[in-house]
């Protein structure tokens, strides 16, 4: 039996609190950057970030964050109900 929702079951303004959590590590960022062939120093070079950025440390790749949030949402929103990903609008970093 499906645990998620079909598109026509969603209502504008629905809010979901997802029970899954995960600590994101520096190694996650390094692995994701390497897997996606992204050499951006902003994500992988601690020395560069300490000298040249206002944050002083590497930033997590925003596409990793988006993918993680989608993954965390699957079990209670779309598990076994997704037919296709129809796209995303208004995604902001």
Each language-model region and where it sits:
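Hot-dog-fold acyl-thioester-processing enzymes
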Residues: 2-87
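Beta-rich strand-turn-strand
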Residues: 92-93
């Amino acid at each position: 039996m499906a645990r998620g929702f079909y598109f026509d079951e969603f209502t504008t303004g629905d809010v979901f609190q997802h029970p899954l959590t995960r600590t994101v590590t520096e190694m996650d960022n390094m692995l994701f950057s390497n897997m996606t062939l992204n050499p951006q120093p902003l994500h992988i070079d601690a020395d560069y970030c300490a000298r040249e950025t206002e944050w002083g440390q590497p930033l997590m790749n925003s596409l990793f964050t988006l993918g993680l949030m989608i993954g965390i949402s699957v079990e209670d929103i779309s598990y076994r109900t997704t037919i296709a990903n129809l796209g995303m609008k208004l995604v902001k970093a």
